[in-house]
């Protein structure tokens, strides 16, 4: 959709338009606020800081992993689940090793078992426990987190959807 907007802008006559580059940039920076789009580095709370993101492929996780590496916190907790048609090994290789993991699965039938994620995660140096639902994983992470910790929920749009539908 954003590509379509860029295409429309590129090939439209903007010479008489009152909208300038600055306004367009501000619009893109506020797209979640203006459109109601949820789940893209969405901050849920501050103490502890809780963020969810729907990134679900290697390209998205290359970006998310950079963001996670810049987070300043005492301890990082990651509630994580995926669907089976994604590059599980490739994505798990991008996850921070210094976090505690809460491996889970969404209600979607294509979800990878939390037990499988844990096994593959351990091969990548990721340490954590398994939870049968996103909400169980979230509750455990929330209870373990201190005010100066960071909790991330993601790995799949379905994981974020389960979280947002049932926890806020």
Across the structure, where does each feature detected by a protein language model lie?
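Nucleotide phosphate-binding/pyrophosphate-handling subdomain across enzymes
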Residues: 1-100
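C-terminal helical cap/extension that packs against the catalytic core
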Residues: 3, 49-50, 91-150
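Short, Lys/Arg-enriched, disordered terminal segments
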Residues: 13-19, 147, 165-168
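Short glycine-/acidic-enriched loop or helix-start segments at secondary-structure transitions
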Residues: 61-62, 88-90, 113-114, 162-165
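Short, well-ordered alpha-helices that flank and scaffold nucleotide-derived cofactor binding pockets
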Residues: 66-70, 93, 119, 143, ...
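Active-site-proximal loop/hinge segments that shape catalytic or ion-binding/gating pockets
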Residues: 156
């Amino acid at each position: 959709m954003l590509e379509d907007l860029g295409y429309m802008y590129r090939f439209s006559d903007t010479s008489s338009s009152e909208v300038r580059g600055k306004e367009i940039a501000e619009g893109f920076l506020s797209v979640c606020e203006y459109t109601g789009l949820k789940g893209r580095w969405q901050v849920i709370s501050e103490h502890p800081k809780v963020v969810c993101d729907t990134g679900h492929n290697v390209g998205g996780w290359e970006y998310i992993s950079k963001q996670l590496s810049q987070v300043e916190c005492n301890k990082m907790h990651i509630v994580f689940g995926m669907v089976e048609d994604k590059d599980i090994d490739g994505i798990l290789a991008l996850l921070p090793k210094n976090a505690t993991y809460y491996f889970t699965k969404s209600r979607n039938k294509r979800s990878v078992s939390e037990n499988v994620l844990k096994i593959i995660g351990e091969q990548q140096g990721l340490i954590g426990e398994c939870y049968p639902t996103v909400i169980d994983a979230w509750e455990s992470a929330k209870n373990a987190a201190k005010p100066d910790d960071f909790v991330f929920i993601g790995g799949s749009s379905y994981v974020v959807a389960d979280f947002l539908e049932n926890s806020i």
